[in-house]
Structures are given as C-alpha cells and as structure tokens.
A protein has these predicted regions:
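Substrate-binding cleft of secreted/luminal carbohydrate-active enzymes
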Residues: 4-12, 58-60, 64-65, 100, ...
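A structural motif corresponding to the C-terminal end of an alpha-helix
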Residues: 103-112, 136-145, 173-179, 209-221, ...
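Aromatic- and acid-rich polysaccharide-binding/catalytic face
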Residues: 37-38, 58-85, 111-113, 119, ...
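Distinct, well-ordered alpha-helical segments
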Residues: 18-23, 46-50, 127-130, 156-176, ...
Length: 270
C-alpha cells in the first residue's frame, strides 16, 4: 500500500484556501504530501517547517518564473537560443544557475526542497539540455541543492530525445545521485472530458522515460510530475475531477520512482 501521491501546484494570488489545513492534517497523520509552488515561497516555507518537526518525507518543489522575477532575464528556459551558448550548454548552465541563485529566497531549505530551474523547454534540443542538466546538477551539488529537470510539456519529448548522449549522461547522474538529481515532467490530457485521452502519449508518458532507462541498463530516476491535470485554464466539476484524480493517482502509485504529482492549479481564476 502506498500513500496518495497527488498534491497541488500553487503560486502568487490564486486560491490556496485550505492548503495549510491540508498540509497539517496529512503531516499529523504522517502521510507525505506533494506541493509545488512558483514564485510564492510561503506555502513551501510552511511545509518545510512542518517537515523539520515531523520528518515526514513530503515532496516539495519550488520554481522561479520569468514573469515572477520580471527583471529582463528568462528564468523559464536556458539561454539555448543565445548565439554565445548555442554550442556551450555548460556555459549556459553556469549563467542560468548564477541568475537563479541570485533570486533564491533566503528561506529556501536546501535539504528538504527541490529546485526546478527550467520549465517547458524545447523538445528538439535534448542533447543540449542533457549537458545543461549535468552541469546544473553539479553546480547545485556544490551548493547543497537538489534539482529536478526538465519540466517538459505534456506529450514531450519524443522517446528518442532521452537517448541523446547528453540526456543519457544526465540519467546516469540521476542514478548515481538520486537524492540530489531528479527528472520533472508535465502530464496533461489537454481535454476536460477524457483524462486518459491517447494514453500513454500524454498522461502516462513517463513510461517512455522508464523504457529508455531499462533499455540502457540505467536505474530509473526519481520523478516529479510537477504539473498535471486537464487543460491550462479549466478543471472539470468535482464529480468528474475526483474519479479522474483517483484513477491517475492509482497509475502513479504503481511506480515507486514517481514521488509526487502536483495538480494544476490553485492559481488565479481557478
């Protein structure tokens, strides 16, 4: 029997009413929960403080966004389109890491919280991104920080993307340092009325990653589904949503490598 892996994705504004109660109740019952937040550190801070006292292994992920930072730098994606870094993913990683570290909240708990440094990146640049991820994970390790990458859009990348030399190198690093380097994925159905549409092409796509790892004799990485749900702007009514959540939760429960999955979204207009 495994605990429910489904948690929530939150951010600035929005509708996090009740999230504190949700966290306290589960923590009190010693049940791990999953929480992802972008830009707004408050909910993660609350969760990490609970964790310090209880030692329940909650899954906490934080990301800094371009929109949230609003300083002219693109925090969402690496500088892979910058001519200076087109052939230098390691240099791109160093720049991106410097920028990210400068924005990291002082309360960030390096022991308990995963940092997600990029989001919905270019599926055609897998080898570049794999090399970028290796350097990022090594820079993070020096700072005592845990990272989870790449937060691919639902339906991406192509399975062959995982087999590029850079990606395989990152997957081997994850296998070597599972407590410090992990893989982040997004899984949406893009439909409100059929959560398993085209399964496992969208929801369930993590299985392609595992197949590639198995093929190359690489232990499967720790996985965070840092966004999942129906569509970007809508969720179905509770009588439809709850069974969908249960069914997707049962799918993820079968794979011990999946640590948590954050429902999109406790944000504005939801």
């Amino acid at each position: 029997k495994v605990p429910n892996k489904i948690g929530f994705h939150t951010g600035p504004g929005g509708n996090p009413t009740g999230i504190g109660d949700f966290m306290k109740k589960l923590d009190g019952a010693r049940i791990p929960f999953c929480l992802k937040s972008v830009d707004h550190y408050g909910p993660i801070f609350e969760a990490q403080e609970l964790m310090k006292k209880s030692n329940v292994p909650h899954v906490l992920v934080f990301r800094i966004s371009t929109r949230g930072a609003n300083d002219g730098y693109d925090y969402d994606v690496p500088p892979y389109k910058d001519p200076k870094y087109v052939n230098d993913p390691e240099g791109g990683a160093e720049k991106h890491w410097r920028k990210t570290m400068a924005k990291l909240p002082p309360e960030f708990d390096r022991k308990r919280v995963w940092l997600e440094p990029i989001n919905e990146v270019d599926k055609d640049l897998c080898d570049w991104l794999g090399r970028f991820a290796v350097r990022t994970a090594n820079l993070a390790q020096k700072e005592g920080i845990k990272v989870t990458l790449f937060a691919w859009s639902s339906g991406e990348p192509e399975p062959s993307g995982w087999e590029t030399p850079g990606m395989l190198k990152y997957l081997r690093l994850c296998a070597k340092r599972p407590h410090q380097a992990a893989v982040a994925l997004h899984e949406y159905s893009y439909l409100e009325n059929d959560i398993f549409d085209q399964f496992p092409f969208k929801i369930g796509r993590f299985q392609y990653l595992f197949q590639i790892c198995d093929k190359h004799n690489i232990p499967r990485p720790r996985v965070h589904i840092t966004e999942w749900g129906w569509t970007l702007n809508t969720v179905p009514p509770p009588e439809k949503a709850i069974p969908d959540i249960r069914n997707v939760g049962e799918l993820y429960a079968r794979f011990p490598e999946i640590e948590g999955a954050a429902i999109w979204y406790l944000g504005p207009a939801f």
